[in-house]
Amino acid sequence: MLFIRRYWTYLTLASLYSVLLVFRLRGAIFRLSPDASYDIFADARNHPFSSIFSFADGYLSVLPRIMAHIIVIAPIEYTAIFSSSFTSLFWILAGLTVYFCAKEIVGSWQWSILASLIVVLVPSARESSLGNIGNVRWQLFIILAVAGSSPYFVSKFSKLLILIALITGFSHPLAIIATIPIVFQFLNAAAPMRNDLKRPLLAV
């Protein structure tokens, strides 16, 4: 019963975030943002797989490039809408992560929803940020920082946190600083406190 209630809670929140994001993307959902999108899709089409680990931007951006490889499978006229959809998906995941972690910490679903809405409704340039897969690194950064600061998430989903840290580290030029200590924190069996993430979170 509790599982079903939680399932419907997260499904309802995801639906709410989706409506808000579609409203925010109005007028831009069918257009590619000029910030990074042109090059990343061209690389995916012209240099499949090898461009995933490209340093063309001066740093690794693995997840956006993997997403670009998936998007270019569809006809080119759908590139913009799929790009916006993928980016919105990560805003939704960031919002749900904030809700989950805040709920475990404060115990209030009202404050938790408010905190998650702050993430989904964060002011941003509509075309440059909301529908730009090149900027999903920021959603990942939010997920890593919030999940890593939640003792409950760390203890219950430690392997998932390592995966998030690795993906973020390979997709964000700054997050690699935090990724290394987070991974070592969990791999070091002799560490006195496996849940002590003050150092890596300070790096974040």
Where in the sequence are the language-model features?
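Start-transfer (signal-anchor) and selected internal transmembrane alpha helices
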Residues: M1-L20
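Helix-to-loop transition at the C-terminal end of transmembrane segments
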Residues: V19-Y38
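Membrane-proximal lumenal/periplasmic loop motifs of glycosylation machinery
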Residues: R26-L32, R45-L89
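Transmembrane-helix motifs of polytopic, lipid-linked glycan transferases
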Residues: S85-G107
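Membrane-embedded helix bundles of polyisoprenyl
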Residues: W111-R126
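Membrane-interface transmembrane helices that cradle and orient dolichyl/undecaprenyl
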Residues: L140-L160
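Membrane-interface alpha helices of multi-pass inner-membrane proteins
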Residues: K159-F184
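Perimembrane helix-loop-helix junctions
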Residues: A178-V204
